UniProtKB/Swiss-Prot annotation:
UniProt KW keywords: Cytoplasm, Isomerase
Assigned EC number: 5.3.1.6
Domain of life: Eukaryota
GO molecular function terms noted in the UniProt entry: ribose-5-phosphate isomerase activity
Listed pathway(s): Carbohydrate degradation; pentose phosphate pathway; D-ribose 5-phosphate from D-ribulose 5-phosphate (non-oxidative stage): step 1/1
Primary localisation category: cytoplasm
Record localization: Cytoplasm
Gene Ontology CC annotations of this record: cytoplasm
Family of this protein: Belongs to the ribose 5-phosphate isomerase family.
Biological process, per Gene Ontology: D-ribose metabolic process; pentose-phosphate shunt, non-oxidative branch; pyridoxine biosynthetic process
Reaction catalyzed: aldehydo-D-ribose 5-phosphate = D-ribulose 5-phosphate
UniProt name for this protein: Ribose-5-phosphate isomerase
InterPro entries in the record: NagB/RpiA_transferase-like, Ribose5P_isomerase_type_A
Amino acid sequence: MLPTFVRFSRIMSSGIEHAKRMAAYKAVDANFPPHAKVVGIGSGSTVVYVAERIGQLKNKHDFVCISTGFQSKQLIIDNGLTLGAIEQFPKVDIAFDGADEVDTNLNLIKGGGACLFQEKLVASSADKFIVVADTRKKSPSDLGIAWRKGVPIEVVPNSYAVVTRQLKELGAKSVVLRQGGGAKAGPVVTDNNNFLIDADFGSISDPGSLHQQIKLLVGVVETGLFVDMAHTAYFGDESGEVSEQSR
């Protein structure tokens, strides 16, 4: 018999995956336009189930799907969907993506998966942007409460030292150049061949202002603060219940 802590961990993991699937399915069922032509599919563990649900649609060959990175490209292909590119289809009917954190005003922190620029590009091109997550990603108030790893910021590689200093001057408690971990020696390199910085500003009461201040720094490509972009967020909990938050 497995030790108690192992069995509990597996039960928790199973419950969380069930929550993600329920939220993803409801988000697609409630929002997918019947005559959509271009659909954005983001990155992350919850979006796996979004792509799964979209792949079950009877008219799935009537639209193209735009990816936000390598993972979502594979999800599109694996679910028998038609892959397109944002260069070909700059106007997106609807986009689905996950989030690292969602505040009470439906602002987001994204970028934990290192795809923030492409994710923001697709989301900003969409007529409707839908967020799907489990309840762990829901902040009780501001951003920076549930997600404690900092704001992901994509930067041009040779600017990271200068940007690091300037982020500290803006009030960041810590600024870390994200590393590749055991699979890669050295920093994470994005799909755009840039570096990622994680800057911890603590609780963020005005994400719009912080985003603008960071974007003004020379070398910053994009921030993981998604402000006033999401239309609706769906959160699944381990019981299978799905809650909805709209702007």
